[in-house]
């Protein structure tokens, strides 16, 4: 039987690539000897690799038991404070027995600069842990960053938003959607690593991500060539220090190794068993791809 506390330790962390509850991970094949490519852009450098109208749908499973559906959708190009941005929105919805035990209906919205690929604003609306009525609202104003301080506000239901400034360690801060979009475009030799700070919901997480190697992945869309990224992560406090209650987690992401660079699967090993988020449908969009 799935306990009600399951939401706090797994489902509530679903959108951050299934890592907030993991212990060890990684379905891995040994990396091959890298071939040095021509000059490659840095992580996240340049326009985001998305197409307006693009939509990806995933099934989330724990040991073969379906828990939730997740979608990642790309909206239109829109103006935000005088800057052209593209809206990218993630949505997680619990299904079946999991929905009756711990309802999830959470939305994560990013406004990503169409030139730099950096997120300028990140808004989250999600159920409070173990509640089916109270909704938490978090807004991170990444465009208003000042020095090492990132303005974040938090409110429960209709309460007045309270400031929760976040201290940062790196020149760039990412949110979950922008991180996944940047991962799509990242090309470098196998073994190349990057340290990042990424917002997942209300909190900031430190991630060390490495290009792991090439695989063949069997999906509902067929057998596809894939590039694997392996990572570790831990939660940070508002002061930018490692949260003493946060263990190091491991996860892997597979992205199609073709022109589409579509996120195909995310896996983690959790205290409850193996968790997989697998693609079940892909719509390429009808607009102009923002990254040539």
Question: Can you annotate each of these PLM segments?
Answer:
Residues 1-6:
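N-terminal secretory signal peptides that target proteins for export/translocation
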Residues 21-146, 185-292:
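Acidic, serine/threonine-rich low-complexity disordered tracts
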Residues 9-20:
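Bacterial N-terminal signal peptides
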Residues 9, 51, 58, 115, ...:
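Short linear sequence motifs
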Residues 146-200:
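Active-site/ligand-binding surface loops and adjacent short beta/alpha elements
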